[in-house]
Every structure is written in C-alpha cells, then in structure tokens.
Amino acid sequence: MKRTYQPNKRKHLKTHGFRARMSTADGRKILAARRAKGRKRLTVSDK
C-alpha cells in the first residue's frame, strides 16, 4: 500500500508557503495569529 505522505517541495510551498498565505484574507489571518503567538517560523518557506 502506498503511504499517504509523498513529499513534494513545490506542492508544499504552493499550498503552505508565504506567498500562498499572503494571497488570501484567511491566509493573512493565519500569519497574524502565528506572529501574535510568537512563532519563530511563520510558514514552511521560512528557514
């Protein structure tokens, strides 16, 4: 049986990256919440 998680960098960034988050109002809410919480990394594109 094939596993459910098949890593793909491009898809990961297209869906969860900073530009993707900024492109929608809800995505910006996520970033605001993570900033408020004090997260070191806001999105997966942060290293």
From Swiss-Prot:
Keyword presence, Ribonucleoprotein: yes
Single GO BP term: translation
Keywords: Ribonucleoprotein, Ribosomal protein
GO molecular function, one term: structural constituent of ribosome
Residues passing through the membrane, by range: none
Superkingdom of this protein's organism: Bacteria
A Pfam family the protein falls into: Ribosomal_L34
GO cellular component, one term: ribosome
Family statement drawn from the similarity comment of this UniProt entry: Belongs to the bacterial ribosomal protein bL34 family.
NCBIfam families: rpmH_bact (TIGR01030)
Name of this chain's protein: Large ribosomal subunit protein bL34
Organism (species): Mesomycoplasma hyopneumoniae (strain 7448)
Gene designation: rpmH
